[in-house]
Swiss-Prot record:
Disulfide bonds: none annotated. It comes from Arabidopsis thaliana. This is Putative isocitrate dehydrogenase [NAD] subunit-like 4. InterPro entries: IsoPropMal-DH-like_dom. The lineage of its organism: Eukaryota, Viridiplantae, Streptophyta, Embryophyta, Tracheophyta. SMART domains: Iso_dh (SM01329). The gene is IDH4. SUPFAM superfamilies: Isocitrate/Isopropylmalate dehydrogenase-like. It comes from the Eukaryota.
Amino acid sequence: MPRPVTVIDSNVTNAVHQVMDAMQAPVYFETYIIKGKNMNHLTWEVVDSIRKNKVCLNGRVNNSLCGGARKELDLFASLVDCFNLNGQPSRHENVDIVVIRENTEGEYAGREHEVVPGVIESFQVTMTKFWSDRIAKYAFEYAHFSKRKKVTAVHNNGKYEKLADAFFLESCQEVAKMYPNITYNEIASRETRAIRRHSNSKSLWAIIANIASGVAGGSFGDDYAIFEQVGSVGNHKNPVALLFSSVMMLRHLLLPLFADRLKTAVTRVISEGKCGNSNTTTQEVVDSVIANLD
């Protein structure tokens, strides 16, 4: 039976439609166009569709678009898949990292208000034990089911939020004991040269995702999931990032054979150098991906 998916339309979502049709993937889309005054947030109509379908593919590059939905749908885990692509130059080699962070507390809570006209106060919500435990369990569960051998907790070494860091690490250490087959370690910002170059920033998780060339990602909760291209590689013409996010979506929908076919086809097209040319049209990339489907 076809799986329903809510789609937030963009210039590249039609590419996903075409490739899914070519694969005869058992999914169908409910498409919504976000424009005008709704560009920075999801309408209730879209949120209701996500509640019904459980899965959303966000074609928009605007990172703030789904901010409200993360809280409304309790999408507590952000996941960014970082990996090298043959045919694409990269500062780092042999990258295969999944970056997971808490999506609804701490610096990503997005709590702010206007104290008096012209003065905005922005503040963070300290990590609670419940949310610290939950994101730690999510990371180890993901590592377990994806057959990854190591989980690394990245923290600020108490430089900015000493109590919050201690809280987070305590949760990770407790959860790690339940997964003896997974190696657990901790890295402070001062121990990583790449992070130290950005030591004035608190967003270590975002920095790592960008340095490691995050391609595809999503936000996940117990009941719902939104898949989207990573903001740093979002492109209004090139559909590759959204196609890789669609690979993640297909795995989430328990359609691994279709996910493997799509990932193989996109990887082939990239290795052949058919995506790096600025003169290449979206349709040419789509046609090449379809031609490479097994």
